[in-house]
Amino acid sequence: MQKTIRSQALIYRKFGDPLKVLQLETVEVPAEPGSGECLVEWLASPINPLDINRIQGNYAVRAELPVIGGSEGVGRVVKAGSGSRFKSGDHVTIFSANTPIWTEFGVVDDDELVKLDNRIPLDLAATLMINPPTAWIMLKKYVNLQKGDYIIQNSANSGVGRSVIEMCKALGYKSINIVRNRQNIEALKTDLWRIGADHVFTEEEFKGTSRQFLKSINVRPKLALNGVGGKSALQISSVLERGGTCVTYGGMSKKAHEFTTSALVFNDICVRGVAVGMWARQEEHLDEWNLCVDEVQKLAVAGKITAIPMEKVVLADHKTAIQKSLEGRSIKQLFVINSKASASHI
């Protein structure tokens, strides 16, 4: 009989309200990985919007039920099977967002794992494979930016937005950052300036001062990064230089993305879209993806990209964490999965 180990896992057996369908259960995991596999002790994983959409059944591709949740995180290899390219003690993350990760232990194919530099702090490592690569690809793939060039983005305080700010600073680009107005707006601006933002405006501020501001810097952005849609997409795409590019990676407003006829016809802007997870799995992009992962890790080790603010919770408190994620008024929730990776170590 095959030896197994018991593992606590967050599982949903039907799609629906995450507060109702997500349950903490005990599962049996093989104690010995097979050839080309690893037994991984998962340490930490965030709750991403993608996770909520999947549990609700709103994602483009529905997983086969039952499903262990999670789409991103960091783990430690406990045991590597024969022929594996990993070794015990390696820190790893997942290449595919379909790999179960809200569980203490799991057996994972080598092809679904990415080795991480063990020097990267665990909270950053847990959130390293979605937001920073998205920022990197958007900054590097679509426009040949040079030091001193300007980019503009909305949703600047999001995970992707913060990665964009830090990478622009590291690469020598200038960032114009648009955020929604809120009660603590001055504190938010100060935080974004702290991590490297060159300019920060609320949507209302930029609407009223964009002409004067662009005249003052005497240049227009070459690249606009759109994670919101609606009027916000119109706002940032309308100030691009002639022939500039607007890349859309999300639609937080849940409204159609708007672009003016003038920007498209007379300013000849290019509008693109990217889903980095899908892009990375296309064989023709493999070399570019590997370069992206290497560069992101170098920035992380050098301290040039940092972990976003997160609240650390254990799996047993998943309902509270999910509720906060659904409400959207709290900072991102990070599951500290294994008892050996207590909050004090992350």
From Swiss-Prot:
This is Enoyl-[acyl-carrier-protein] reductase, mitochondrial. SMART domains: PKS_ER (SM00829). Keywords: Fatty acid biosynthesis, Fatty acid metabolism, Lipid biosynthesis, Lipid metabolism, Mitochondrion, NADP, Oxidoreductase, Transit peptide. It comes from the Eukaryota. Catalyzes the NADPH-dependent reduction of trans-2-enoyl thioesters in mitochondrial fatty acid synthesis (fatty acid synthesis type II). Fatty acid chain elongation in mitochondria uses acyl carrier protein (ACP) as an acyl group carrier, but the enzyme accepts both ACP and CoA thioesters as substrates in vitro. May provide the octanoyl chain used for lipoic acid biosynthesis, regulating protein lipoylation and mitochondrial respiratory activity. Involved in iron homeostasis; affecting Fe-S cluster assembly and ceramide metabolism. The active site is at Y59 (proton donor). NADP(+) binds at residues 131, 157-160, 180-182, 249-252, 274-276, 332. Its EC number is 1.3.1.104. One of its GO terms (cellular component) is mitochondrion. SUPFAM superfamilies: GroES-like, NAD(P)-binding Rossmann-fold domains. One of its GO terms (biological process) is fatty acid metabolic process.
